Amino acid sequence: LVGSEMCIRDRSGINRLSFGLQSANNQELKMLGRIHSYEDFLESYDAARKAGFENINVDVMSALPAQTVISYEITLKNVLRLKPEHISAYSLMIEKDTPFYERYSEDEYIRAAGGKPKYLPSEEEERRMYKLTKELLAEHGYNRYEISNYAREGYECKHNVGYWRRENYIGMGIGASSLFENTRFHNTCLLYTSPSPRDMRRS
């Protein structure tokens, strides 16, 4: 979202945005198959602030192909300079039967990283990244309230906390899940069978 697109806040009542930055390193973004750059993210983030959004989350990822502890620290510090209200820090997990897994090979990522001999961080490096996340975010006033989620006081994600408390939530759109009075159900995943958002079924 850029520029005038941010006016959705005034029309829809949306008051929180989440940006999937993942990394401030454009080479790492390319290896993840992301189509945005760090500069694109900065432009959108700035537009969101100018539009009046006062509750913003930024996603970052560690243990990426060819990522180092130093490059990850740079990503964290770049995000912290922006002072978002919430930061989600995830460690990459490569799952079978996903597009990322299918195109995952040592040679591909070595080439993409400019000939680096190592394409995934070691377990020791992953642990250092995890420790760095906790310490650096705590130093800047972010409280860890879930495994991967950190927030300034009062900005914990109500949606996430609601899951743990089994609170009611209604999912809108194709394939969206809901929980109401301890009953889980979800919308159809087929567009042509869903003439109305009320077309749901129990699961």
Language model features with spans:
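Basic polycationic patches enriched in arginine
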Residues: 201-202
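C-terminal scaffold of the Radical SAM
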Residues: 4-5, 9-194, 198
